[in-house]
Regions:
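Conserved core of the PLP fold type I
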Residues: 1-110, 121-144
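General small-molecule cofactor/ligand-binding pocket signal
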Residues: 51-53, 150, 239
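Hydrophobic "anchor" residues on beta-strands that sit immediately upstream
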Residues: 79, 113-114, 150
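Walker B catalytic acidic pair
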Residues: 118
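Active-site PLP attachment segment
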Residues: 122-123, 132-180, 189-192
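Amphipathic alpha-helix from the class-I
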Residues: 175-177, 195-217, 234
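Conserved glycine-rich beta-strand-loop-beta hairpin in the small C-terminal domain of fold type I
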Residues: 212-226, 238-247
Length: 247
């Protein structure tokens, strides 16, 4: 999915978003970056010379007062990076209110987009304690902003890092815009790899069951760290840590 995100930024730079001015022809392009966050996201925007604005993260997601201030008043702000579920490094997930506030924004830039990296959509550690995040595409559509989000996902942290299946979900208008590039960029994707994944998983239930096996390996490691932190540092008021339900 990192490739898809890179392509999306690159396409916006060279050809613009749905008929808007290509970013490379603008004097300034800015991006909101919730911190702490994913370094590979920030590497992409840094590589293209995009000015990055730090947005503090809270337990419910990015500081929405700041996000709304920048998005609604500054037309040079073209996007925001988001990892809505089990966000690194805290493991926090976006609250319902945060998702709704994002979906209801009225950006100053007509080509503003939410870059929604759903990297850990089914990466739960527990069966009985799982975070659930509102469906951003549905919320944007309800708010009258169907084109405002690109939703990315992949099997990189399910099957093969860097060699899985990536996907982008977005509005019909955005998809039509993206396909203009894709039909030039490639004849077709790796259908053998796609078939391999389908035959292995069969359906979403197969994927969920597979992720339970990952959780059985990871859970003891998470719990070991939590137990040591509690035992050695608990009550000393010299540090804080989170206890994520997945990631």
């Amino acid at each position: 999915s990192l490739n898809v995100m890179y392509d999306t930024i690159s396409r916006s730079m060279t050809h613009g978003v749905m008929g808007n001015t290509p970013w490379c022809k603008l004097d300034k392009v800015k991006f909101l970056c919730p911190v702490p966050g994913y370094d590979r996201h920030f590497s992409i925007t840094e590589y293209f010379g995009i000015e990055m604005i730090n947005i503090p993260m809270t337990a419910d997601g990015p500081d929405m007062d700041l996000v709304e201030k920048y998005v609604t008043t500054d037309p040079t702000v073209k996007g925001i990076w988001c990892v809505p579920k089990y966000s690194n490094p805290t493991g926090n997930s976006y609250s319902d209110q945060t998702v709704r506030r994002l979906a209801r924004m009225h950006p100053a830039a007509p080509d503003f987009r939410i870059y929604w990296d759903n990297a850990y959509g089914i990466h739960h550690l527990y069966d009985d304690e799982q975070d659930h995040v509102l469906e951003i595409l549905a919320e944007c559509k309800k708010a009258g902003n169907p084109d405002m989000v690109y939703k990315f996902s992949s099997t990189s942290k399910i099957t093969f890092p860097g060699s899985g299946i990536a996907a982008i979900a977005t509005s019909h208008n955005n998809l039509d815009d993206i396909k203009k590039q894709l039909k030039i960029q490639t004849i077709g994707h790796d259908k053998v790899n796609q078939l391999r994944h389908v035959r292995f998983f069969k359906d979403i239930h197969g994927m969920v069951e597979h992720m339970r096996k990952h959780a059985n390996i990871l859970r003891p490691k998470f719990e070991a760290v939590e137990n040591i932190l509690d035992r050695e540092l608990g009550g000393l008021e010299i540090g804080t840590w989170t206890k994520p339900h997945g990631g």
